[in-house]
């Protein structure tokens, strides 16, 4: 019989928030008897933007902004029904994007 696996991918702009959410997921899964692999930190995606300061002249004067997207990956191997219910009821902060895939 093939084992089922849940792959969870977290994305957030704040690394403290994403680490806290990952820790909550790991504790919940372990408490319900599932095996957790991770969280694995994926490469941080950085987007840089150069904006002209002046609306008319002075093209050499620019502001630079950057946006960092932190990512974590976790696998929950052979989850029970109790694990899935606990993960669905878990309340995570609004700044964390969660993608869940069943494999």
From Swiss-Prot:
Record's GO cellular component terms: ribonucleoprotein complex; ribosome
Keyword Ribosomal protein attributed: yes
UniProt keyword terms in alphabetical order: Ribonucleoprotein, Ribosomal protein
GO molecular function, one term: tRNA binding
A biological process from GO: translation
Source species, domain of life: Bacteria
Known function: Involved in the binding of tRNA to the ribosomes.
Protein family membership: Belongs to the universal ribosomal protein uS10 family.
Subunit structure comment from the entry: Part of the 30S ribosomal subunit.
Matching HAMAP family: Ribosomal_uS10
Protein name according to UniProt: Small ribosomal subunit protein uS10
């Amino acid at each position: 019989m093939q084992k089922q696996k849940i792959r969870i991918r977290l994305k957030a702009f704040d690394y403290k928030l994403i680490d806290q959410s990952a820790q909550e997921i790991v504790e919940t899964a372990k408490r319900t008897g599932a095996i957790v692999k991770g969280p694995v930190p994926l490469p941080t995606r950085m987007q840089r933007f150069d904006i002209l300061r002046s609306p008319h002249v002075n093209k050499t004067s620019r502001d630079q902004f950057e946006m960092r997207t932190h990512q974590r990956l976790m696998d929950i191997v052979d989850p029970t029904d109790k694990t899935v219910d606990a993960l669905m009821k878990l309340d995570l902060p609004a700044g964390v994007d969660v993608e869940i895939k069943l494999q």
